[in-house]
């Protein structure tokens, strides 16, 4: 199962964890190399970082479809308004047998019919593009909902904090070969011994 990618991407410098959680060079390097591309740490602290799958195509497709569909819809509405709102001209002039056909009026009326047909076609194309836009948007939202999982709070805390042992919060880099921290004072050879005050006895 791939690790969840609900972690918000932030480009701010410095650690963004609570105080007392992570210490040492290793944790700060992990925070530094965690960029806004969706890089997340795996459950294994020693394993390589796992990149979150990026899906730019659904978002890009529905944005392009929405823009194109809106533009075509506006053009179609304008063409239909022109075709139906503008009154046609009379093609025949005269009465009875003396009927003269006005070619300009015929061309004008034919242009109005072409505007109506073009407006209908543009509206149909806009509807198809808007349907594709809605389809891609639903695919993107469903994929985000199905692949999103809650983060495990124990997976983020790679270093455990103990109240009695503060030197365990340090990174292994700051430890020598014997396992002792460089910043902690050396252990006393006498162990934890209590200091007693001895007073000399007075001669009576």
From Swiss-Prot:
Give the UniProt record's GO annotations in the biological process aspect: nervous system development
What InterPro entries does this protein's entry cite?
Neurensin
User: What is one term from the GO cellular component aspect held by the record?
Assistant: plasma membrane
Q: Which residues cross the membrane?
A: 66-86, 122-142
| Keywords noted in UniProt | Membrane, Transmembrane, Transmembrane helix
| Compositionally biased tracts (Polar residues) | 190-204
Give the span(s) annotated as Disordered: 178-204
Keyword Transmembrane helix part of the UniProt annotation:
yes
User: What is this protein's function?
Assistant: May play a role in maintenance and/or transport of vesicles.
Q: What is this protein called?
A: Neurensin-2
Native organism is: Homo sapiens (Human)
């Amino acid at each position: 199962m791939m690790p969840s990618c609900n972690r918000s991407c932030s480009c701010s410098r410095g650690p963004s964890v609570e105080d007392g959680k992570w210490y040492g060079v290793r944790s700060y390097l992990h925070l530094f190399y965690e960029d806004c591309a969706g890089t997340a740490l795996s459950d294994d602290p020693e394993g390589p970082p796992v990149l979150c799958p990026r899906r730019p195509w659904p978002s890009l497709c529905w944005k392009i479809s929405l823009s194109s569909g809106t533009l075509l819809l506006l053009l179609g509405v304008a063409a239909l308004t022109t075709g139906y709102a503008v009154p046609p001209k009379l093609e025949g002039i005269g009465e009875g047998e003396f009927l003269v056909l006005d070619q300009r009026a015929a061309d004008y009326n034919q242009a109005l019919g072409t505007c109506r047909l073009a407006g209908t076609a543009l509206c149909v194309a806009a509807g198809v593009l808007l349907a594709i836009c809605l389809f891609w948007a639903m695919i993107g939202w469903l994929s985000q909902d199905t692949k999103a999982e809650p983060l495990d709070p124990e997976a983020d805390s790679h270093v455990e904090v103990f109240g009695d042992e503060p030197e365990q919060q340090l990174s292994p880099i700051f430890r020598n070969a014997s396992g002792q921290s460089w910043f902690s004072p050396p252990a006393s050879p006498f162990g934890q011994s209590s200091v007693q005050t001895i007073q000399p006895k007075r001669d009576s």
